[in-house]
């Protein structure tokens, strides 16, 4: 028959009574009385009896809330009176529990002690002792830990409460203390290569706008090249590319350039593809070279020299016309008004060179009036009639015929440029109309408000001057050839 072992019952004293929150004065009275809460109506919250209970003639009772909520601790880390009372009760219960476990382990047999160690009693976080900010070190040395010991082969770290005990409210001081990280197996306790100081970040000098922009430009210089140069040698070595692109227009961009959506994007794209700079270089080259208009006295070697110079001039003009055609084929800057204006001046300059070649005299006895001043960029009908009325010899008529046979190239160039000028003229006219009526935005994406400083009348005048100069030059050459 099994006997009842009363040794363990007599040896283990009874547990300490559990102190409830209601006994500590931490409960909270409900805002609504029991009658209003049961009836699901709004309570007037009148103590000690609400008006609704009085009107109904029933007893008004206020009960304690089931969830009173947590009490906040003060800034120094000390708990409130309710928390301190519960902490004291918990610490006393834990100390009595530890003494009971020690006495039971000394009196009980090894089997019972092993069973107790293998099955520890479940504890909650509120039963654990909380160290105070004043005596954290003492709490670590006197208060026992009821947590199971950690495995030393993995991590030998003290509990968090013991680590943060002397640093209850200063977390950064914990990071600055090297002894906290000493138990880690792969961590250097010297802390010479790690700086956890929080003030070093605020002591760094603030970077101003100039330094920040300079830093960005330094980074950009490593990623983006300063200049973009085209491989002209490979382009000229290709027979197809060399035949399609003239020698003077080897660096003119092709239609593969990215399309522009707005005027600012178009302007930036034109600057990146160097269309405007190429147009200015062409205009500068045309202005620097002079046409052979000086008369010669004899029909011998001088006639051959004049004809060769006229042929060279027409060859250069042909190359200039091809360059301008390539400029107009660039899709990224086709709406750039400044580029169109520069191209119009180039066309007028080419017509002026053709007129100078048509005025070249061979074997004449009279002297020509000479080249027209460089300031007269735009010729008119009377200006063309005056020099073209002095053709005396066969050499002069040959030069005029050669010029007349080349004017169809200029006609194609004007026909290519004219739609672009009209498109920009219409867009600028609508933009000026919007601004005149007080509208600062345009009706659609294609209309740009004040996209250029050139007025629409300027573009219309340039188109009219090109067509007038071309028709006047061809008509005068035909009339003089018929008269002679």
Curated annotation (Swiss-Prot):
Record's description of how this protein is used: Notoamides have been shown to exhibit antitumoral activities. Notoamides A-C show moderate cytotoxicity against HeLa and L1210 cells with IC(50) values in the range of 22-52 mg/ml, but the IC(50) value of notoamide D is greater than 100 mg/ml. Moreover, notoamide C induces G2/M-cell cycle arrest at a concentration of 6.3 mg/ml.
Biased composition (Basic and acidic residues): 123-133
Pfam family, one: AflR
GO MF assignments: DNA binding; DNA-binding transcription factor activity, RNA polymerase II-specific; zinc ion binding
Region (Disordered) residue spans: 70-154, 363-387
Keywords, ordered alphabetically: DNA-binding, Metal-binding, Nucleus, Transcription, Transcription regulation, Zinc
Biased composition (Polar residues): 139-154, 368-378
Subcellular location: Nucleus
Biological process, per Gene Ontology: aflatoxin biosynthetic process
GO cellular component terms given for this protein: nucleus
Top-rank taxon: Eukaryota
Function of the protein: Transcription factor that probably regulates the expression of the gene cluster that mediates the biosynthesis of notoamide, a fungal indole alkaloid that belongs to a family of natural products containing a characteristic bicyclo[2.2.2]diazaoctane core.
Signal sequence interval, chain numbering: none
Composition bias, Low complexity: 76-122
DNA-binding region: 33-60
UniProt-listed PROSITE patterns: ZN2_CY6_FUNGAL_1, ZN2_CY6_FUNGAL_2
Protein name, as recorded: Notoamide biosynthesis transcriptional activator notL
InterPro entries registered for this protein in UniProt: AflR, OAF3, Zn2-C6_fun-type_DNA-bd_sf, Zn2Cys6_DnaBD
